[in-house]
Amino acid sequence: MEELQGYLEKDRSRQQPFXYPLLFQEYIYALAHDRGLKGSLFYEPTEVFGYDSKSSLALVKRLIIRIYQQNDFTSVVNDSNKNQFVNHHHNNFGYSHFYSQMISEGFAILVEIPFSLRLVSYFEKKEIPKSHNLRSIHSIFPFLEGKLXHLNYVSDILIPHPVHMEILIQILQCWIQDAPLLHFXRFFLHKXHNWBRFLXTPKESXYVFSKXNKRLFRFLYNSYVSECEFLLVFLRKKSSYLRLTSFGLFLERRHFYVKMEHLQMQHLILIVVCLDYXQGTLWSFXXXXXXXVRCQGXVVLASKGTHLLMKKWKYNFVNLWQYHFHFWYQSYRIHINQLSNYSLYFLGYLSSLLRNSSTVRNQMLENSFLIDTVTNKLETLVPVIFLIGSLSKAQFCTVSGHPISKPIWADLSDFEIIERFGRMCRNLSHYHSGSSKKQELHRIKYILRLSCARTLARKHKSTVRTFLRRLGSVLLEEFFTEEEQVLSLILPKAIPFTFYGSHKERIWHLDIIRINDLVNHS
């Protein structure tokens, strides 16, 4: 355990003190309002009741004054817990809600500063060619294809949640030495509204992703997940004496700016990267006998060893977890399965090993014999049932997959309705371009196409058949434009188009930096 502590302290040697005084500087809130450092983080501006953006600077100055006054500041935080729909408190809530959000955003900027400096220093010391390619979610599947086919066992690990607030404060304390800032964070997190269910399961606490706390939530969650990665890295280093140069290629994904850039939350309907609860954050390492991948709150650990070896990994991880975080880790969160008989649901794909056997007849002089060869291939399939469940939750079809209209879109123009449905279909096709059987997407396309027709018919008080006849060619062009035709405009013309026409070819893209909404909604 002392060795683990020394390993962690070595990585945290560059702590940043004296961040609390910056909380009283106006430019910190200007950074928060302007998407933070270099605009790399997702941010949604605040709407204050009865005020425009021009008056926000005056409100920020008033906020700084109230922070100096302890009693006044306490009332600001407590007022944010009041019901925003109470009419006689309408204006007071406008102030309180704005103050609470600005404090949250300003604090997020402050705690991000040490990690942004660390990331810049990391890239200055170590240049990684084409590191931008590693940012794609799809980049992890070629890694899995090359590794899982030679491994025997796989463990699914769920990172524990919810997390007690004091654990998050202790994690920040490891990186930040500024005691006043830590006390401020503890006070704010315990007083602010909705934090009693912080880091609950994403399907039970979608309201946590409010405009007021989204940025700070993502930062704290990533700091927590980063500590989990420390434990896996420590076990990896102690389980093998082989030093892998490829490990560094993936390590930069741990840094917060790279993570949080992918952690955008486009809709409350879903994201997340997991339980991220946030989007497409990937991390992995490989050894001669083990490989591990993490996305959001799910970790996949595969090994070529025995079932006993996987159990040792499991109990070592559980013991280190309980020692480091000081709370119980339920062992049932880790499932060990034989890879040959297991389908792994990961990043919107059902992945399993497909055994291919081939027989070769070998003739040597007068003797002939048969050679049987068995190879394992990673098969990635589209989970149609899960996608239909997502479409059902989003009210595009029934639970059984029967298309229905989308009433809330009926007020849009015909062009916008068709464009929205078509964009969903194209995004799904793009995200699942790595599927071994792309025909499975045809049913999803059919549901979206017929749902679009029903929505248009509902808007114009007509029949579905009428709109299918009238807009048949337009709908076909929107929903059934094959991805190969798009690729033909991108790839060199010298390659015959028949190459793109094959439905058996899996294509992994390097521009997908977040999990598809419908995939994560299931």
UniProtKB/Swiss-Prot annotation:
The residues forming a coiled coil are: none
Domain of life of the organism encoding this protein: Eukaryota
The answer to whether UniProt assigns keyword Plastid to this entry is yes
Q: Which GO terms describe its biological process?
A: mRNA processing; RNA splicing; tRNA processing
The terms describing its cellular component in GO are: chloroplast
InterPro entries linked to this entry: Domain_X, Maturase_MatK, Maturase_MatK_N
- Keyword tRNA-binding in the entry? The reply is no
Where in or outside the cell?
A: Plastid, Chloroplast
Record-stated family: Belongs to the intron maturase 2 family. MatK subfamily.
Described by its record, this protein's role is as follows:
Usually encoded in the trnK tRNA gene intron. Probably assists in splicing its own and other chloroplast group II introns.
Q: What is this protein called?
A: Maturase K
Instruction: Give the originating organism.
Output: Iris danfordiae
Print the organism lineage. Answer: Eukaryota, Viridiplantae, Streptophyta, Embryophyta, Tracheophyta
